Amino acid sequence: SYTADSLNFDTDADLLMHTNRELMNAAMKITEDALQIDLINNAGVVRYTGNATNNYTLNENDELTYRDLMQLSIDLDNNRCPKQTTIITGTRLTDTKVIPACRVAYIGSELIPTLEAMVDLHDAKAFIPVEMYAAGTTVLTGERGRVGDFRFIVVPDMVRFAGEGGASTSGAFYDTNGMLDVFPILVVGEESFTTIGFNTDGKSSKFKTKNMKPDELYSLDNP
């Protein structure tokens, strides 16, 4: 526990530093989750797999297929969604590289088996692993591979709609309290993405943190 006694008597001489690091990591995870939820809930185009019309009508026959991805790509084309994303790279995140002729799709790690087992309309393997095309393009962090017009990025902490699908009957799918879990795929057509790091940009600090030790008091004058 984070107490004055633990700071004074714990065998870990760097306990305060470790505590601050874990608090920062937790704050970042909360921020990332909130951003994911906001992006998913405000998507301009929403498509459900199979014949479902919302989360609650998804059943065990509605597992993601190549046809679902093809129909999603057509919907995005009809809505004029671009196929060009810019990533910002470099030590100080100032270099830009364009990812052409594709859309970036973010998925949870739970969807990896579904993607790698996917076949196209001719019963041929649809999934192309990233190492097959990495030499000819810029690979994104966490990129797993490609299917059709989509390049899939695995996000280990991707949000899910736990227990918001139909009834789970076979036990072969993720579920919560007997109801199927729904795993969203977030597709991005353009705009820039970067990583948030602790390094300065050379001109200013990115942020400041203030930690109050257990024996220090908060107040309106000292928030």
Regions found by a protein language model. Name each.
Residues 1-2, 21-22, 223:
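Oligomerization/assembly interface segments of phage tail-like spikes and tubes
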Residues 6-89:
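Alpha-helical scaffold segments that mediate packing/assembly in large oligomeric complexes
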Residues 1-14, 88-117:
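Structured, hydrophobic secondary-structure cores that serve as assembly/anchoring elements
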Residues 55-89, 110-223:
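Sequence/fold signature of self-assembling virion shell proteins
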